Amino acid sequence: MLLEQRLEFIDSLPTLPTITQRSLLALPEFSEKPEHDINKPTASVMPDTIDAFLPGVSQAIIDDVNLCKLVMQNAATKKYPEDAQLFEWYRYYVDGLSRLGWVTQNRNLQEITIKKVGLTMDQVALEMAAGLIGANAAQILAGVAKKAVEAVQKDPGAIKIFDTHKKLGTQAKFDVAPVWLDNGGQANMILNCISLDARESTRGILFWKSTKQSTTIKSGAVRTYLDTNIFSGLRASLYKRYSESGKKFIDDLPDF
């Protein structure tokens, strides 16, 4: 795809929702936080999404990853808003990220059953990652993902952002995505889209824990990386259009 076509795609994407003054007051104040130490793991929270960053990921890359995902999740949700449209939502989301420079293979969601009591959302994400990068590597990523989920659970402002689209008693869609750098310095990510029946939890998917012997989920997960050569030509346009409005939907958590 030509650079001009990618830029036209960015221009065609919908704007982020407008937050009312009342809602804005309920969101966390983006006060001064300690500067991110590149040698430590950290995390960010967005609606339905927790991005868990391993040591070595700079703040600039964190910002790039978060904004790409926020913009495309918003576009996919506006195009396919119904729970029953999850398959279409996922395909549009993955295809859109590829237009922003993420190199991945489009893969349909699949239904799988995990036979385990007491499952939490980060453990479900681990199951997805293990099939892509192997159990040992997935365990390393899982440690950071678990800390990320726990950090969000303890932060009322982060919970509010994560629960932006929460509807209790229904299917819940979420993404717990580990992010790390490859030897070329490019961001790699397990791109998740996981949907399951969250009626067991009265507080939503963030605090969900399975009580059944098995849990059936719809899941799509692919390993992907951000091609810096492509994204460098798109960054300015993406940030110009979405950086300011995106701040209301992204909260960078303190390092672990």
Q: What positions do the PLM features span?
A:
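C-terminal assembly and membrane-engagement modules of membrane-active proteins
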Residues: 1-78, 87-91, 151, 155-256
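Alpha-helical rod/repeat scaffolding segments in eukaryotic adaptors/tethers
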Residues: 79-86, 110
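Membrane-inserting effector segments that mediate pore formation, membrane fusion
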Residues: 110-163
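Generic N-terminal initiation segments characterized by hydrophobic and/or small/turn-forming residues
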Residues: 4, 51, 64-67, 94, ...
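Membrane-proximal, non-transmembrane alpha-helical segments
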Residues: 99-111
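Short, charged cytosolic
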Residues: 84-98
